């Protein structure tokens, strides 16, 4: 019996897509080369300087991350409260 549970072989990205050219890692490689050294793992860190990882995060981004959806939920909750209170005003209490 095979114990396959619908798992597929994980596909790893091609290592050649990560380039250090145009990143701060290139400067580090040049400084190391001037001393006769080389960082063979430099390319493994190149992903940090490409794509969505390069956007710097500001205090504003962190503090107001969910503000838009939170404010919308607040408005809906306040609207529901006022609506439910208006229904209660129609009922006479002794």
Swiss-Prot record:
The keyword Cell inner membrane does not apply. One of its GO terms (biological process) is mitochondrial respiratory chain complex I assembly. Pfam families: NDUF_B12 (PF08122). It comes from the Eukaryota. Methylation at His residues by METTL9 enhances complex I-mediated mitochondrial respiration. The chain crosses the membrane at residues 62-84. The modification N6-succinyllysine is found at residues 19, 30. The keyword Phosphoprotein does not apply. It is a single-pass membrane protein. One of its GO terms (cellular component) is respiratory chain complex I. The modification Pros-methylhistidine is found at residues 3, 5. It is found in: Mitochondrion inner membrane. Belongs to the complex I NDUFB3 subunit family. Accessory subunit of the mitochondrial membrane respiratory chain NADH dehydrogenase (Complex I), that is believed not to be involved in catalysis. Complex I functions in the transfer of electrons from NADH to the respiratory chain. The immediate electron acceptor for the enzyme is believed to be ubiquinone. This is NADH dehydrogenase [ubiquinone] 1 beta subcomplex subunit 3. It comes from Pongo pygmaeus.
